[in-house]
């Protein structure tokens, strides 16, 4: 396990260096480690927690969650086996990036082929299971589109709206769709942390509908405003939204949301605002 971890750390370091050195390519799939670790620490995953990243990239959130569980708890043999094989789930649309994710997890002694969905569009289908925790940084880019070939043989991009009966609004906005998808992935009392750009906070129409329903159906307790430039794409204004899925009997008028602007990402962010999950140890089939 230790030897695997050393090789894994070297491999992850190479991924991070490539993300820093490349304007396109790995950088679009790599979330800065300091941000990942801060989010994971305040979320406080426990042994037995079923965790999914529906836009996994190279697997940084899942690796960090596993690392924090191993560091914070003394696990017995069954708990270690569960963490290695049943606790972490990844979905990644880009097949080559999914292979990087699989290698990253396997070099750290984590995951298996059943837990990594490669080349799958998270947004295309309603979830077949629910999870205790969702940690994710969906790819930035406002609109979803598909490339088609027209009669002249030219490639044309067309806007793609996601039609799902578990979504509150139909829209081509990828971030709004990911936000709705994350809510659908959660068990009752499950918890989520999702990185989102500013357009999700202020867009009208479908954006307003999604925000109202999220505030009504979930406990949206914390919004962390990130400093500009934390991502490799310059000028991107981003936020981390923390929320818990409430039982239907507890839906009510929205409670106040705690908001902060962080000049420096540290592991102490909002630790008093987050509550441990009361959900069971594994994904629930639906």
Regions inferred by a protein language model and the residue ranges of each:
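A conserved structural/catalytic subdomain of Rossmann-like adenosyl-cofactor enzymes
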Residues: 125-286
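Non-catalytic, mostly N-terminal accessory regions of nucleic-acid modification and defense proteins
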Residues: 1-47, 113-122, 225-229, 250-255, ...
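Charged, low-complexity, helix-prone segments enriched in Lys/Glu/Asp/Gln
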Residues: 18, 69, 83-85, 280-284
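Conserved S-adenosyl-L-methionine
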Residues: 25-136, 140-145, 150-154, 176, ...
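A generic structural signal for residues located within well-ordered alpha-helices
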Residues: 6, 31, 96, 174, ...
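Short glycine- and Lys/Arg-enriched binding-loop motifs that mark or flank ligand-binding interfaces
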Residues: 23, 53-56, 186, 231
């Amino acid at each position: 396990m230790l030897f695997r971890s050393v090789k894994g750390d070297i491999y992850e370091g190479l991924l991070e260096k490539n993300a820093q050195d490349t304007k396109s390519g790995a950088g679009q799939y790599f979330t800065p480690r300091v941000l990942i670790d801060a989010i994971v620490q305040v979320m406080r995953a426990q042994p037995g927690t079923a965790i999914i990243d529906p836009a996994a990239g190279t697997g940084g959130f899942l690796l960090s969650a596993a690392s924090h569980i191993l560091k914070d708890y003394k696990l017995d043999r069954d708990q270690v086996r569960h963490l290695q094989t049943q606790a972490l789930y990844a979905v990644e649309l880009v097949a080559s990036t999914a292979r990087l994710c699989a290698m990253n997890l396997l070099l750290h002694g984590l995951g298996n082929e059943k837990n990594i969905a490669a080349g799958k569009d998270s947004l295309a289908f309603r979830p077949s299971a629910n999870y205790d925790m969702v940690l994710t940084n969906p790819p930035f880019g406002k609109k979803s589109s598909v490339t088609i070939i027209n009669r002249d043989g030219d490639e044309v991009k067309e806007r793609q709206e996601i039609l799902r009966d578990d979504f509150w609004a139909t829209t081509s906005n990828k971030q709004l769709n990911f936000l709705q998808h994350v809510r659908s992935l959660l068990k009752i009392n499950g918890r989520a942390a999702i990185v989102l750009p500013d357009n999700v906070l202020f867009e009208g129409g479908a954006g307003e509908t999604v925000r109202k329903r999220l505030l009504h159906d979930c406990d949206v307790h914390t919004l962390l405003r990130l400093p500009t430039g934390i991502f490799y794409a310059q000028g991107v204004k981003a936020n981390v939204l923390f929320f818990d899925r409430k039982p239907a009997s507890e839906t009510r008028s929205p409670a106040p949301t705690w908001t902060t602007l962080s000049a420096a990402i540290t592991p102490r962010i909002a630790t008093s605002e987050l509550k441990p999950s009361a959900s069971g140890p594994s994904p629930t089939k639906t």
